[in-house]
């Protein structure tokens, strides 16, 4: 797996994790917002790393 594929895979995993948090009915809104915030920060980091390396990420 090359670096681009690795970043795309990580981006897909984060996107799925965000969706799972959104759909989780067993956590409070405060916890949900905190988890989403952390996952979005991680997603932005992955996208930034791709841009830094001049990699066009398809999942973004």
State what each model feature region is.
Residues 36-46:
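Short amphipathic alpha-helical coiled-coil/interface segments
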């Amino acid at each position: 797996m090359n670096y681009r594929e690795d970043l795309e895979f990580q981006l897909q995993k984060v996107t799925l994790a965000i969706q799972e948090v959104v759909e989780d009915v067993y956590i409070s809104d405060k916890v949900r917002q905190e988890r989403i915030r952390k996952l979005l920060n991680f997603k932005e980091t992955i996208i930034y790393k791709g841009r830094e390396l001049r990699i066009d990420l398809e999942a973004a």
